[in-house]
Amino acid sequence: MSLTTLGNHPKEEFALVEIATAILTEHKEAMPFSSLVQEIQEFLEVDAETFKSRLSQFYTDLNTDGSFISLGNNEWALRAWYPVDAIDESIHELDDEEDAPKRKKSAKKKVNVFADNASDDDVIDYNDDDPEDEDFGTVTDDDTETDDEETEVEVESDDESNEIDLSDDESIDANMTELSGGDDLDDLSDGDQEK
């Protein structure tokens, strides 16, 4: 399918993946994603802002569609161009190119940080005080004194207003009956009989 074949139908009806397939088929080589997007945008004759809203979905479709393959460095090609063995080799070639310029690192000196040798600067001495603690000074017993004397608080009580007259049982029972809804279910001491 080429761009000329796509020209027979309205451009809006085509999926971006179909247009990308036609563009890659016409170019017959892998293309960077940005170039592919630019050509699709030119084919659809839309401005950048309109196309930008569809860009993330297009990239997702490009990844999930089985007919495209990423060759690294954001270059895309048609999977049909590469047999399965060649795909694996081309990907490993890219990995080998990235690995080649690395230099060997010199071996690091191992240090036992718990050693008893006090002359070594790398040894951690857990018995030393933290130097930041010295900024605040030492705490003495005078600074932490608390009042050992108990403070008495006088509470005035109004005995008459808080006391209940226990001699008037009938008024208490009437109030209790009023609060409980009138049914005396569990108290048989007031003369009620069990039914």
UniProtKB/Swiss-Prot annotation:
<protein>
    <recommendedName>
        <fullName>Probable DNA-directed RNA polymerase subunit delta</fullName>
    </recommendedName>
</protein>
<dbReference type="GO" id="GO:0003899">
    <property type="term" value="F:DNA-directed RNA polymerase activity"/>
</dbReference>
<comment type="subunit">
    <text>RNAP is composed of a core of 2 alpha, a beta and a beta' subunits. The core is associated with a delta subunit and one of several sigma factors.</text>
</comment>
<dbReference type="InterPro" id="IPR029757">
    <property type="entry name" value="RpoE"/>
</dbReference>
<dbReference type="Pfam" id="PF05066">
    <property type="entry name" value="HARE-HTH"/>
</dbReference>
<feature type="compositionally biased region" description="Acidic residues">
    <location>
        <begin position="120"/>
        <end position="172"/>
    </location>
</feature>
<feature type="compositionally biased region" description="Acidic residues">
    <location>
        <begin position="181"/>
        <end position="195"/>
    </location>
</feature>
<dbReference type="GO" id="GO:0006351">
    <property type="term" value="P:DNA-templated transcription"/>
</dbReference>
<comment type="similarity">
    <text>Belongs to the RpoE family.</text>
</comment>
<keyword id="KW-0804">Transcription</keyword>
<comment type="function">
    <text>Participates in both the initiation and recycling phases of transcription. In the presence of the delta subunit, RNAP displays an increased specificity of transcription, a decreased affinity for nucleic acids, and an increased efficiency of RNA synthesis because of enhanced recycling.</text>
</comment>
<keyword id="KW-0548">Nucleotidyltransferase</keyword>
<dbReference type="GO" id="GO:0000428">
    <property type="term" value="C:DNA-directed RNA polymerase complex"/>
</dbReference>
<keyword id="KW-0808">Transferase</keyword>
<dbReference type="GO" id="GO:0006355">
    <property type="term" value="P:regulation of DNA-templated transcription"/>
</dbReference>
<feature type="region of interest" description="Disordered">
    <location>
        <begin position="120"/>
        <end position="195"/>
    </location>
</feature>
<feature type="domain" description="HTH HARE-type">
    <location>
        <begin position="14"/>
        <end position="81"/>
    </location>
</feature>
<dbReference type="InterPro" id="IPR038087">
    <property type="entry name" value="RNAP_delta_N_dom_sf"/>
</dbReference>
<keyword id="KW-0240">DNA-directed RNA polymerase</keyword>
<dbReference type="InterPro" id="IPR007759">
    <property type="entry name" value="Asxl_HARE-HTH"/>
</dbReference>
